Amino acid sequence: MAVDTEKDSVQAGSPMETPGSPVDETTEPVVTSKTWIVSMILSCGYGLSFWPIPVVSAIGTMISADMGDPTGYIWTLCKETNPIIGMDYLDHLCFLDLVCFIGHIVVASAKSTNQVIAGLVVSGFGGANCQMAAFALPELLPNKWRHIGVVIADLTVYIAVIIAPVTARYGYELGTWAWNFWGVAIFQGLSFFGLLFLYHPPKHPLGIPYKEAFKSLDYLGAFLFIGGAVPFLMGIVWAGVYDSNDVHVVAPLVVGAAVLVCFALWESFGKLKYPLTPTYVFASSWGRDFTAPVIALGVVNMFYYSSSILWPQMITVFYTNGGADWKYSVILSLPQGFAIFFGAMLLTCFGSKLRHWHWQLTGSVFVMVVFGSLLGIVTPTNKGTMIAFIFLSQAGFGWALYLSIAITQMGVEHKNLGVSGGISGCIRFAAGAVATSIYQTVYSNSLAKYTAIYVPSAAISAGLPESKVTDLMAVVSQGAAAMKSYSPAVVAAAEAALSQAYCKAIFVVAMVSMAFGILGLAACLCCKDVDSKMTNKPTIIRRD
């Protein structure tokens, strides 16, 4: 992709004059001011589309409760839907900013959880496709800056991760939470106009006219993919609400999985002119070019969600008196966002110096997995240690995430960059949805299990009659205020036992996340080094 009016402004003979000209690797590449402006607009469009995620994560449960639907928040966390349909052929990103703009307005004006969910679905559709900025932006720059381009694409996301939880909580407490969406809608609209006037995608490398592209799209494949992915993800969400053997869980999971198998068979044996997921992309170099790094990308994203679930729970349960000290809770939420930014900056500054990209990916994933798994040794008193572990784990995540995206881009030919982006985005967000459901289900089940083990025996030892254990269990998770009818000794014993149950539940989730992390490490070891592709040459095709 490129800014089509920029060609005349590039210095004659510069390394970026034409994509096919020989490139002097000893000369630093020239990138014009318009390219940087468009790069920043692309970054803003993506980051602004991501803003609702940390906002909803911070205050979604409270908003749902205030609107009279305490369980509605479950669906607000499942908004990112990344279609791969035609992303290799239809790639003008300004339209997606407009979609996000509409979604933000719907949420900001919401009077019910259903309207919030509807708005998040709209903005999620646009936002999941806005993540194509991670592919559109780096190809404007020389290949050796590919990892830096991915970091720049997420630059506004860092701001969202760090600031949005703060503005969300303050906005909720002050009754102005909707401005988290009104404000973002304004800037998303400005991003739309910026891309509309300054960014013009080049001709597709396959030379396919838009009319032919629409005719040649794999509509049956798209139908099968959507028809399988939607019920499958619904089943995963229901697993956090119903028992695992309930029809609400089993039926959509089975139907969704069966349809996805049909989708895979259709893509593999359908003899399609332009398949959504070309098999040769996955099979290249026995999967080492693209399949291994995209698996690593999905697992890295899965590991992020374990920390995003465990750390807020630890803050609420152990460090802020059940969330009563919400200002201190906001402060404790900052290390995670700053750590991701720090890891991304380390990649930007040292990636090209260290080279050996596949070993960088392996090392950063190793750091993420080790320190993320060590969150499982939490106690109510080791706050400093946990802050250090969450920072180190998320710094590893920041390095690994953007490097894995860059390596997936390098694993395909330029003509398949849209396919790579669509598949990578689908796997990234689907893995996140699966991980979120697994972690939440494991956490809630483990907490219930260990609460039933530790609390009754502790309370009885403190003098509680066995006949009152059932009544105590009904209110123990609501805090000391709900246990006023019990003696101080019983309350203290019950709270200590409940803290122990929380520690055990967190440990189990940390071990589950470690299992995923080991899978990610195996995928990293299978990746190929892309150093030979890190050249001064940009992967762009300009309009003539």
Swiss-Prot record:
The keyword Membrane applies. The chain crosses the membrane at residues 36-56, 90-110, 116-136, 148-168, 178-198, 221-241, 249-269, 290-310, 330-350, 361-381, 387-407, 418-438, 505-525. Keywords: Cell membrane, Membrane, Transmembrane, Transmembrane helix, Transport. The keyword Transmembrane helix applies. GO terms for molecular function: transmembrane transporter activity. It is a multi-pass membrane protein. Induction: Expression and the subsequent production of PR-toxin take place under static culture conditions (oxygen limited), whereas no expression of the PR-toxin genes occurs under the strongly aerated conditions required for optimal penicillin production. There is a negative control of the transcription of the PR-toxin genes by the penicillin biosynthesis gene product(s), or by a regulatory peptide encoded by a small ORF inside the penicillin gene cluster. Residues 1-28 are annotated as: Disordered. Gene3D superfamilies: MFS general substrate transporter like domains (1.20.1250.20). InterPro entries: MFS_Str1/Tri12-like, MFS_trans_sf. It is found in: Cell membrane. One of its GO terms (cellular component) is plasma membrane. PANTHER family: MAJOR FACILITATOR SUPERFAMILY, PEP5. Belongs to the major facilitator superfamily. MFS-type transporter; part of the gene cluster that mediates the biosynthesis of PR-toxin, a bicyclic sesquiterpene belonging to the eremophilane class and acting as a mycotoxin. This is MFS-type transporter prx5.
